[in-house]
């Protein structure tokens, strides 16, 4: 019952950014791992930090599980909603907000994909070195401490992320 109440409250607050469509839910039920899919009760498409705060507050108030979803490229079932609940899709938060060539840093939203970021940075003579193999989102890479083929030379996410807004 709590899940239905939470979904109803989220729909009232976020409108059509809340989906219970079976196809959408199925897409968010798995990643690239071998684990069996588990359907979330609903998927919420966040478009701003305020949306994320709203979803977290509603899920917390109703004690409904909440699992963030980036690109679904994890090999460890990190985004799989093993207890159902809400899958919080970050793909619409995909903007590069600031680039500082002088400081060699960049501010991005969590849904920015690795290849997208490198395309933007190339125009500034910069690149993002973490390469886990998949075209993961920066949020997903930060949440898992991603590394890859360039880690020995440049470091993993934990060496390269200066700050996070949570």
Task: List each model region and its residues.
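Beta-strand-loop-alpha "switch" segments that mediate conformational coupling across diverse proteins
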Residues: 140
């Amino acid at each position: 019952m709590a899940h239905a109440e939470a979904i109803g409250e989220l729909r009232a607050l976020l409108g059509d950014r809340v989906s219970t469509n079976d196809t959408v839910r199925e897409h968010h039920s798995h990643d690239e791992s071998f684990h069996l899919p588990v359907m979330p009760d609903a998927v919420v498409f966040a478009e701003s930090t305020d949306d994320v705060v709203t979803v977290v507050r509603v899920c917390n108030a109703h004690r409904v599980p909440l699992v963030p979803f980036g690109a679904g490229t994890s090999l460890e079932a990190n985004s799989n909603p093993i207890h159902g609940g809400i899958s919080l899709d970050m793909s619409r938060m995909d903007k590069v907000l600031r680039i500082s060539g002088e400081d060699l840093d960049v501010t991005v939203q969590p849904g920015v994909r690795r290849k997208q970021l490198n395309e933007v940075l190339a125009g500034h003579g910069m690149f993002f070195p973490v390469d886990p193999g998949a075209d993961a989102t920066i949020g997903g890479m930060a949440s898992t401490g991603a590394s890859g083929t360039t880690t020995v030379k440049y470091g993993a996410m934990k060496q390269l992320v200066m700050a996070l807004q949570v």
